[in-house]
Amino acid sequence: MEPNPGNRVSSLGAATLIGLCLLATLALPARAEPIRVSADLTPAAAAAPLRISGGAVHLTLEEAIALALDQNLSLRVVRYDQARARENVAQALGIYDFLVQGGLQLSSDTVPAASNLDGAEVQESDRAGFQLGLSRLLPTGGTAEVNWVNGRFKTNSRFSILNPSYSSGLNLVLNQPLLRDSGREATERGIVIARNNREISRLAFVQRVTDLLREVEEGYWNLVEARYQLQVSEAALDLARRLHEQNRVRVDVGTLAPLELVQSEVGIATREEEIIRARFAVGNAEDRLRQLLGLDRDAQLWAAEIVPESEAEISAPLLPVEKAIDRALDSRPELASRRTTRRNLEIEAAWRRNQLLPRVDLQATYKLNGVGGDVLVRSPDGSVIASAPGGWDDALQQVADLDYRGWTVGIGFSYPLGNRSARAQQASAELAVEQASTQEQELELSIATEVRMAVRAVEAAAKAI
């Protein structure tokens, strides 16, 4: 007595339908509405708690996806990459931070006279200096500085007119590259690359979300299929046992040879082995789904049976193959990431070409000077006969009134003869751009092939139901 053929047809149809669901996760958009996923390290909304009833975890596909997006550890790792990429942009923008510099110096000297013009047999002098400066990189590649310099000098020389004397000065300094490292593109190369890397990190997050959705759906339907295969195996075992009992009755009445009992016993053993394998597959599918959902290593959660509640439903592809390929090429994050990487390499190649130019820098300085102090009136022998008080405020007033000015303009030039290092780096950068372009074309072809094969598989599976 053979098992009912209708059961086989039903089993084949159900298994094909589940397989069709798995293929659809690769070929077709899984849902009409976009899924919104937070990229923050601490997502604002948590997934709904697990529904545990009768010692089993009851789970729909939507609940599984929500849990995975909220708790999956690999997705959390990618969130850290995004946070680091944002900080890297802030670090790159730091090139435009103002730099404050300052200093204070005190000194005292005692020097024996080397000439009558020293004004004392032992010349004694005390100095004090204070500087404060502010500098910043310019988008053009140059640097601008403002320096405020102050000093105090006191000596025992009889030739000094201002004693103590105070000096103050305001210096405006500009250093501007004219060829190499000139321009916004060269200056902000690191900023643009950091922003592109942030976009690459975002695309990696999108890619991981996409992969996770596919993995969860595959894991969910694999569990559904494994549980169904277990049910089929159990039904087959029950049928084999009933067949064995029927054969036993027929042997007892003499209408069947005893050898048939041995064959039916072998059938029972085979079905029992299939059940062992089916239960093994169910356990593996449950553990894989638990891992994707990021469940805590709680013994109760990992021991509880997972009962999937969603039913397998699928519709035929709505898009023609060529439109599906075009949509994939426009939306696949790995391709967008590859294109952004190529743009980074193009920026690097442009900067390397700039490094082939000579170093020509324009240096310009504009100064405002002032001096003040006690004015001493001396007799012919150098002794002080009168004095007029003065101080640092006199020097500051002269600077503010623009009384004493000065300026300097110059050009600096440097160029390594041969420039082999820069030429080799530029050639390597150009090759990297060409390589990235080829890899991009390869990925486009791979995506198009993958979509065609996936759509064909879905259509074939749909016809097989």
Residue ranges, per PLM feature:
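N-terminal secretory signal peptides that target proteins for export/translocation
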Residues: 1-11
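Periplasmic alpha-helical coiled-coil/stalk elements that build and connect Gram-negative outer-membrane
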Residues: 3, 92, 202-324, 457-464
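Bacterial N-terminal signal peptides
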Residues: 14-27
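Regulatory alphaC helix of protein kinase catalytic domains
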Residues: 43-67
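Small/polar, glycine/serine/threonine/aspartate-rich low-complexity segments that form flexible
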Residues: 50-56, 104-172, 307-317, 350, ...
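A glycine-/polar-enriched beta->alpha junction
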Residues: 67-76, 83-98, 131-164, 172-190, ...
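Amphipathic alpha-helical coiled-coil scaffold segments and their short linker/junction regions
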Residues: 68, 179, 256, 260-265, ...
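Amphipathic alpha-helical coiled-coil segments
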Residues: 77-92, 208-232, 242, 249, ...
